[in-house]
Amino acid sequence: MLVLFVLSLVVSCALCQTFQYSRGWTNGKRSNFPAEISALGYDRFTNGELKRLKMLIYGSADEQPLLIHCDFVDKLKKFAHTDNAEPDQLRREKAPNNDNY
């Protein structure tokens, strides 16, 4: 019984290794996309956006270019710096708790 188990283990290892080195298993390699498909993705991004995406994927010590400019934050800062706005206006007031759950 043990001989049969060892023999089947050896045969399965040999078959798996043969399959791995055949065309069935690429071992992490990826096939190349056709040029017309890969070119479509680059048209969607501007040069700066593509550079930021590459920095995000590959990692970079300088995180400043990855920060996204947000108009809402600028408007909020302008609102907070006006004379009419006080910092308490930006906070939400607590509703009275009537113990109604």
From Swiss-Prot:
Keyword Secreted: yes
Primary localization class, coarse: secreted
Signal peptide interval: 1-16
Known tissue expression: Expressed in central brain and the retrocerebral complex but not in antennal lobes, optic lobes or in gnathal, thoracic and abdominal ganglia (at protein level).
UniProt-recorded Gene Ontology molecular function terms: corazonin receptor binding
Pfam families: Corazonin
One term under GO cellular component: extracellular region
Subcellular location(s) of the protein: Secreted
Gene Ontology terms describing biological process: neuropeptide signaling pathway; positive regulation of heart contraction
Propiece span(s): 31-101
Superkingdom field: Eukaryota
Residues modified as Asparagine amide: N27
Family: Belongs to the corazonin family.
The protein's role, per its UniProt record: Cardioactive peptide. Corazonin is probably involved in the physiological regulation of the heart beat.
Name of the protein in question: Pro-corazonin
